[in-house]
Amino acid sequence: MPDELPPGPPPGPRDPGDAWAQGPDGTKAWGLFGAAGLLVDDGAGRVLLQHRVEWSHHGGTWGIPGGARHQHEDAVTGALRESAEEAGVPEDGIDLRHTSVLDLGFWTYTTVVGRAARPFEPVIADRESLALSWVPLAEVDDLPLHPGFGASWPALRAAIDIAPVVVVDAANVVGSVPDGWWQDRAGAADRLLDGVTTLAAAGLPAAELGLEFDRWWPRWTVVLEGAARDASAASTAPVDVVRAAGSGDDAIVEVVTAAVAAGRGPVVVVTADRGLRDRVTALGDGVQVRGPRWLRDRL
């Protein structure tokens, strides 16, 4: 720890959330509005862990950067802010994967799970860390873990490689509602892409994907064909735009084949085309199909 950072909690004004929440039985938990932390892996089999300073709650143990949520702050924003403040994690350098929520009724702790979008080295930026380290997955259990993180780690570890994908048959979805889309197919595709981009940023409830935990952020691929290929929207993570050179169905099958081969899944294909449904579900047990209404209801 740098010499210029003396031991003890940071001085100065604090957010109203930096206080103890108390349950009806007298149980206390830090964070008046709940708390959140970030579990980030580097895509190479390591996770970023924090060795907690002795004066902190469960000091001397290893866990993830995190802390009390600020007033009116959502859990994802809180986790990214805390990890930036404590460990120098770049807030724009994390691809969200899922959230796991511990709910005690009067208080919640949200573990936000992400993957580093680009390499970075953590930096001790405040008084709350003795050390920060990228720890190989196989060595996490060898450390003295914070009790809360230790209890959640087995389930989090088991899901570390789950990578859901949603593939959208744009022609089928756009054509499912007679709203005049045939007069401007490119414009209709752009409107669909705007909605998908908003949905991708918000994530999907885990149950929608048949997964555990609270919420997931899949990778989305929207396949355009014909005149819709003239849509102005470009690929912007986590939404990929594929402009099919020929058959849109063939392009969707190629996207799903590549996802399955890469070990990604579950893969959800949004289409009402029966022939396409049969082709994609034959590619693997992890491939599911939803109709256009499923997507439209969420848009």
Task: Please state what every model-predicted region is.
Residues 2-37:
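Acidic, metal-coordinating catalytic segment for phosphate/diphosphate chemistry
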Residues 36-40, 112:
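Short beta-strand scaffold segments in enzyme catalytic cores
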Residues 46-47:
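Entry beta-strands of beta-propeller and related beta-repeat scaffolds
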Residues 56-60:
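A conserved beta-turn-beta hairpin within the catalytic core of GNAT-like acetyltransferases
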Residues 62-72, 181:
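Short histidine-centered catalytic/ligand-binding loop motif
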Residues 64, 167-168:
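Short hydrophobic beta-strand that contains or immediately precedes a catalytic carboxylate
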